[in-house]
Amino acid sequence: MSPKARVLIYVLRRDLRLADNPVFHEVSRLSQQSQHPFTHFLPVFTFPANQVEVSGFVSDSAKKSPYPEARAPVSGFWRCGKLRAKFLAESVWDLKKDLERIGSDLQVRVGTVHDAVQSILQGYKENNQVDIAGVWMTNEEGVEEKREEKDVRKLCKEFDAEFKLWQDEKYFVDEYVHFHKIAAQYTRLTETP
């Protein structure tokens, strides 16, 4: 009998690039070791129902979406405009193509990160031929993002899976010695030492 497959799940949210993503680099490094901690790698992106209107993903037009409309609770405005939705979709498909080019793939879900991760963990638990090597996410700022991280951490505990939260590397304030030198405009921020 062959040993069980060990799957490492990487939950992507805003870090939708392959080239400069530290998690993908670490996975690549670990996979080249003789004793790597996983046999399979599963990157997952979930179109967030609380941010993006997902009713269009329901295949049967007679059925209602299981998620409420993605409107701001106070103002009632849509939380995602068409340009942001287009940018997000293009980023997801570009990442999927980049991963396919190197022999991997991206699982795309719709709903909540909690529901997606729970579904995957439950499916592997029922399979009984697969162990979860871990669930990795990148730390994000924001109340909803922190709630997602807490929910996934709780799910991992429930399913006895290791949870790792990576530091977001978009910016480190500690890198700036003199705060008065931080540019007020983004175009100048990229030039700030």
Spans of features found by a protein language model:
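N-terminal beta-strand-loop-alpha-helix module at the start
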Residues: 1-104
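Beta-rich, aromatic/charged-enriched effector core domains that present basic-aromatic interfaces
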Residues: 105, 112-193
